[in-house]
Amino acid sequence: MNIEVGTTIKGTVVKVADYGAIVRLPGGKTGLVHISEIADAYVRDVRDYLNEQDEVTVKVLRLNDRGRYELSVKQG
């Protein structure tokens, strides 16, 4: 599946860390939701909002120079 910047798609949280969450996208690709892109409010602990295996809707913000997707839940 071709994932384009600006699209909104569903994914599954596969890892939660202090800095954000890794989300598996369709086609087996993964992307990062940085802690600042989880909610409009201040996020002290990512686990208050996201947990592994959660289904989330994310917006694809960009594909960085390393070929990694940067995602947003709050814009999704």
Please name every model-derived segment:
Residues 1-76:
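Single-stranded RNA-binding regions, centering on S1/OB-family and related RNA-binding modules
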